[in-house]
Regions:
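N-terminal helical cap/lid subdomain that shapes the substrate entry/recognition surface
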Residues: 2-112
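Asp-based, Mg2+/Mn2+-dependent phosphohydrolase catalytic module
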Residues: 1-14, 26, 43-48, 90-92, ...
Length: 233
């Protein structure tokens, strides 16, 4: 019997990573950084110097406030505030520059397979988001699929820490091994879920065996196909 079909009867809730799991995040990040940099250029920074300036202020901020590494939004805003302060800009400018980044960051294209998968899973399982990113699922238009949404920073410590997984187990009132987590990253998603006592689905083309508690699929489409087989089983 298919391993997923054997596993799913014991699962009560399914969690999802977002970036590079439910959509391709690469171009979105490029576009968001470009939007941020265009806003910085308008304030007088030279395009060719922005990467170095940003890195310097990022390193300084992380050194002074390492806890911000669990909140990508707060960290980016603090870095922009540091740049603004160094250049004597008005306090509101950093927020405006961050907003340019954030708005572009929400322009993701959810995979058709992801929508179909969520539609089917929603009928039989509680669903969750556990993400280190700052995409707002409401703005993206998929919030209605999820019973809870946890984002690192506002809702807990960033993956691979177990914090948000444990909170999800508690919120759903389920045992650790009744939770299945789907993500693309070997450490932050698959290993993190297993460390929290749960099962993992790794969406990754790399041929890697993480043990019996992790099932690997090359694509989300492949995973969806097995889910549909289970639901029709």
């Amino acid at each position: 019997m298919n391993k997923l079909i054997e596993l799913l009867p014991s699962i009560k809730a399914v969690g999802f990573d977002l970036d590079d799991t439910l959509w391709d995040n690469r171009q979105t990040i490029i576009d968001a950084v470009n939007a941020q940099n265009e806003a910085l250029v308008k304030q007088g920074l030279e395009q060719e110097h922005i990467a170095v300036v940003y890195k310097e202020h990022l390193d300084k901020t992380v050194s002074q406030e390492p806890e911000l590494q669990s909140d990508v939004s707060a960290l980016r805003l603090r870095v922009l505030e540091s740049i603004a302060n160094e250049h004597g800009w008005e306090a509101s400018i950093a927020g405006n520059i961050y907003q340019a980044f954030y708005e572009a960051r929400q322009n993701v294209l959810v995979y058709d397979d992801a929508i179909e998968l969520l539609n089917h899973l929603k009928k039989d399982f509680q669903l969750a988001v556990i993400s280190n990113g700052n995409v707002d699922v409401k703005q993206v238009g998929i919030d209605h699929y999820f019973d809870l949404v946890y984002r690192a920073g506002p809702d807990g410590i960033a993956k691979p820490h177990q914090d948000m997984f444990v909170k999800a187990h508690d919120a759903f009132n389920i045992n650790d091994d009744e939770f299945l987590y789907v993500g693309d990253h070997i450490v932050n998603d698959a290993q993190a879920a297993m460390d929290a006592g749960s099962y993992a689905i790794l969406i990754n083309e790399e041929d890697i065996d993480l043990g019996p508690r992790c099932l690997r699929y090359k694509t989300l489409s492949d995973f969806k196909a097995d889910v549909l087989r289970y639901l029709k089983f």
